[in-house]
Amino acid sequence: MSAFSGAELAYLRRDGERRLGRIATVGRDGTPHVVPVGWRYNAEHDAIDVGGRDLAATKKYRDAARSGRAAIVIDDLASVDPWRPRAVEVRGRAEAVSEPAALIRIHPDRVVSWGLD
């Protein structure tokens, strides 16, 4: 069974519509670090995979490897008039995967969504 609802999966699986998300990690000193990233839904692991150029050399990758925690929000605007934001936020265990290519895999502990109806 998926950690995501049917509406959340439909939103995440719309290829090419939402390729940018924002990942949040926590630095060694407790400071939050939030940056835009590319992502994809990984159906095999029911997780969000975050990738990027030279990812293993980044602060977000080191933070995720050290703390084992991360969050990501994937969002867009269904309409600007009226204002209708929609999003899926995933908080969970972060796995710093190194092979075959570096990525951060976020396994959901908590999923919150809004505006998907």
Predicted segments, located by residue:
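Short, basic/aromatic recognition patches
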Residues: M1-R22
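A generic local structural motif
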Residues: G6-A10, V34-P36, A57-K59
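Structural motif
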Residues: H45-A47, R69, R110
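Short, structured beta-strand-loop surface elements
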Residues: D54-H107
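Flexible glycine-rich active-site/ligand-binding loops centered on an Asp-His dyad
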Residues: L103-D117
